[in-house]
């Protein structure tokens, strides 16, 4: 039997993910966010060593960091808009995939320019991850717990940012 729905009846929608899925989603989103934020500062520690190993001046070597940060700033709003168009999950998963590939390239790089270009692309992938991160929280958490989700998100950024 088919029932019609009049304008006064509301169709119930799921409010956030059910509990086991919610935990996995929070861990996945949190881990990806942690890696993208952690990679902003991770090179700072080895900058003098990289400068020595690549035979570049410390001022030139800072472009390994600057390239990553500029890529994030340049593309953050674009990836956010792209998430609205094609879906947050697609942008997020593409960002994670590219982040893993560029991390491998960074680890295997044998020259200053290879590392710098890989870090720039890593910055674009980190931008894809972070641009849709907050938007995904409203699908993960029920409306009554969205503040908790934002708090956990902010805590992940604070801890991973040092």
Residue ranges and their predicted role:
Residues 2-162:
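Transmembrane-helix bundle of Major Facilitator Superfamily
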